[in-house]
Amino acid sequence: MIPLMHDFEGETVLVVGGGPVGARKARTFATEASVVVLSPEFADRAFADAEKVRAAPDPEDAEEWVERTDPALVVAATDDSALNDAFTAVAEEHGALVNRADDHGDQSFGNVVVPATVRDDPVTLAIATGGRAPALSKHLRERFEDEFGNAGLMAELVGDLREDLRDRGVPPAERRDAVRLVVRSREVWKALDSGRYKGEQVARDVIGELPGDQT
């Protein structure tokens, strides 16, 4: 599989199954998409802003539900393999993406894998092991969160810094070098623990005087 970011803004995701896995999938996609969760019962978990539809579809009902919701993605997250098979087949016939929550990495049972994800806007990190080592995905995600907890702040700082250096007439090569110095600086990362302003101050010190600065 090839990693790919997909914009679900304005689209619908149909989650079939209201257990803990279905709830987790609903929370993931509800950050952008309109999510419909179809299940005869729902786990005592948060489903974010998803619409919960209480129904017990049979495999023969998959066509009707996919046509009714017109999803960009179908998540098959029940413990009934026949039901998951039916929704997978119908979704593929309708050109929708498919994520099989009861399968790990086999494209014949779905063409989408939802990786372990870290979000610190505007930074998004996704980690996948093809279903072979979920514990490793979780470990790597937690390690990133611990070591780069200010990734979002760093991205904002560096983005503004690039614009500032460009406006000041600093040549492209020097701009790239300056940005590399900042993102590799332990001092800047540590300073961001005290907020954006402190991080900017230390970043300026790290960069120092740059050739081509016309200010």
Predicted regions and their residues:
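Short amphipathic alpha-helix with an adjacent loop that forms part of the alpha/beta core around
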Residues: 59-69
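Structural motif
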Residues: 12, 72-73
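Conserved acidic residues
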Residues: 55-57
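An accessory alpha-helical subdomain
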Residues: 129-215
